[in-house]
């Protein structure tokens, strides 16, 4: 019995147990959100409205993250659409329980998306960038879809 419990909590045969999995998830999420809060403060202070979504796509990456990583650049005005599953010209499935893209923290809003990003255990980062670094074709596309302020 003790061995079964140990395996479930800590892990066995090279697989993490529940305690280890959750500890890693909370640690990864906290560190990345801390970094994201700093990036948001910088972008707010500098008045930057364009962002680049960066990071590695993994087997566990969510559909939202895959699509936004492929899109690469986004404008602050697009965030509201992200929360309803609209990323560029693609539509992402929404969770029935939260009404947000799968994996998103249920408290995600337009105001905190830059910090919470793709949700629990999201390893992607959002970096503010100057308008001049965004390709004109991307700017035109966003202008046509959501308008720019």
Question: Where are each of the predicted segments found?
Answer:
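Domain-core detector
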Residues: 1-121, 127-149
């Amino acid at each position: 019995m003790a061995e079964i419990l140990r395996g479930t909590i800590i892990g066995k045969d090279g697989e993490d147990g529940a305690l280890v999995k959750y500890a890693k998830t909370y640690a990864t999420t906290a560190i990345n959100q801390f970094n994201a809060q700093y990036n948001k403060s910088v972008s707010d202070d500098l008045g930057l409205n364009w962002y680049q979504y960066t990071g590695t796509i993994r087997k566990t990456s969510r559909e939202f993250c895959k699509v936004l990583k492929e899109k690469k650049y986004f404008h602050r005005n697009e965030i509201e659409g992200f929360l309803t599953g609209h990323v560029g010209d693609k539509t992402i499935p929404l969770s029935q329980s939260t009404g947000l893209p799968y994996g998103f923290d249920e408290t995600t809003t337009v105001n905190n998306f830059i910090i919470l990003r793709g949700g629990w255990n999201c390893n992607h980062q959002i970096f503010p960038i100057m308008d001049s670094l965004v390709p004109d074709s991307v700017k035109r596309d966003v202008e046509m879809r959501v308008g720019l302020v």
